[in-house]
Swiss-Prot record:
The keyword Cell wall biogenesis/degradation applies. Its main location: membrane. It comes from Buchnera aphidicola subsp. Baizongia pistaciae (strain Bp). GO terms for biological process: cell wall organization; division septum assembly; FtsZ-dependent cytokinesis; peptidoglycan biosynthetic process; proteolysis; regulation of cell shape. HAMAP family: FtsI_transpept. The lineage of its organism: Bacteria, Pseudomonadati, Pseudomonadota, Gammaproteobacteria, Enterobacterales. The chain crosses the membrane at residues 22-42. This is Peptidoglycan D,D-transpeptidase FtsI. PANTHER family: PEPTIDOGLYCAN D,D-TRANSPEPTIDASE, PEPTIDOGLYCAN D,D-TRANSPEPTIDASE FTSI. The active site is at S308 (acyl-ester intermediate). Catalyzes cross-linking of the peptidoglycan cell wall at the division septum. It catalyses: Preferential cleavage: (Ac)2-L-Lys-D-Ala-|-D-Ala. Also transpeptidation of peptidyl-alanyl moieties that are N-acyl substituents of D-alanine. Keywords: Carboxypeptidase, Cell cycle, Cell division, Cell inner membrane, Cell membrane, Cell shape, Cell wall biogenesis/degradation, Hydrolase, Membrane, Peptidoglycan synthesis, Protease, Septation, Transmembrane, Transmembrane helix. Belongs to the transpeptidase family. FtsI subfamily. Pathway: Cell wall biogenesis; peptidoglycan biosynthesis.
Amino acid sequence: MKYFFQNKKNIHIKNETFNNRITILLSLIIITIILVLSRITFLQIIVSKKLIYKSNLRSLRTQIEFNQRGNITDRLGYPLAINIPVKNICIDPKLLFSKQTHIYPNLKWKMLSTVLSIPLSEIFYRIKYSKNNHFIYLAHKVNPEISEYISQLHIPGIYILDDFKRFYPFGKLTSQLIGFTNIDNEGIEGVEKSFNKLLMGKPGKKQIITDRYGRIIEQHNLVNKIQSHDIILSIDCSFQKFIYHILNQAVMSNKAKFGVAILVNIPTGEILSMVNTPSYDPNNSSELFKNNPLIRNKAITDIFELGSTVKPMIIMKALEKKIITPETVINTSSLVVNKHIIHDVSYHHALTASDILKKSSNTGVSRLALSIPISELIDIYSKFELGKSTNLGLIGERNGVLNTNKKHWSDLDKVTLSFGYGLMATPLQLARIYTTIGRYGLSKPLSIIVKNDTNLKNDIFSKQVFSKKIIKTVINMLEEVAKPGGAGFKAAIKGYRIAVKTGTAKKINSKGKYDNKYVSYIVGFAPVSNPTFCLMIMINEPKSNKYYGGEIAAPIFKTIMQKILKIKNIKPDAYL
């Protein structure tokens, strides 16, 4: 009986102990739940914004979203500058170090080094040097085949981003005009630079959230992005191609420093071709360095004295002042001006005003210039915008030189001004003068970008700068230049009436003295019955035994213009 009660007491004690333990356990659970809920409440309500901010610092990033650069095409849609897809190989150094990845030259890294032609030591140096950065470029503009190979290596921290690079289908034929871009796809020469904002648009920004491996898991709306635009040039690639080859052959055969050819549509003012030779390949990056003289578009960046190509304007002014008629006979023997002898290449005692242009007589225009006030000589040059930029929109175009503010002009100044010395212009500005003459004195802006309203704008800004009747008379005189006995007879095209003027100018050296180096010109238009195409040819420093414009440039003019008239099915007008 005693044992029974003793045992019952023990059971009671055990039950009480068990109950106490349950109570303690339940209390601990309840306390834990309360603590967890309190912590959750604290995190979710009190400091949630702060934690989200800190988290975002690790995973939320702003990404720049670039546009595909706009294409450049000719007037018929042929591509002059396009984008081809490439890849950029990138590394996340911070990710590699945060994961405490042991970077060592294993086989995969060696394969990466080999395919990119980057020494392994350099790769590791870049990673270590930028260990606090999430992003560095390892290689730019990699072919997709190479990037796919790298992708299959599955190297931690290596990322591949889409990109593009410029390709120029016509290469050397359009390089100085079109230019090229840098590694960031920004235009740094030619049309690429001049219209860079239009071609690039404006990149936008978007926020992305990444996981611990750098993969994008969420992205927010793109903001502030302005779309890029394509550009259509007035250039006709069919013209550009054959003009380049003809001019290039002429430059080589004459051992010249370089040549420029410009073709303009006279009625519209559109530039149909702008050629420089020798040229360079814009697809070969090794040729794209700043001091390469081949990069300049010399049609707009270089200025030269114009030689006899300015003489028609002196004749115009003399006709306007009724000093002469086309049949007026003028003394063309040598004359002395301020102790300087002015003479012609071929001696003629006297010539008609028309023959002064035909034979390109310096003495003839000199005597006319001496009879005209200097202010009126400057005025006629200014009316044809000599010395002024064409405002074509191409960066790098220079103004010419026409000293309108000079107070004291000697007779020698007037005389030399009449045959193209003491003033300077770009080849494009010379082409503009003769385009205006071909339009019978109606000046319109030149253009190289095709727009729906181009002709409307050109009409708005057009103005008659000189008497239409007088200019028609001068055009008839210029027609004689290409006939037998004329300075430009080698430019003659059978069956067609053409109006041309040749020119030859000595070059000034760095000391301001004239060297025995020359610039040879011919500029004119066809057909005379309906002036449609203006062509300017300039050959710089021919080193053959010939250097006169009529000998060097005239045959080039003939070959090119003859082909243009044939391609465009312009009917012969010589017998109309």
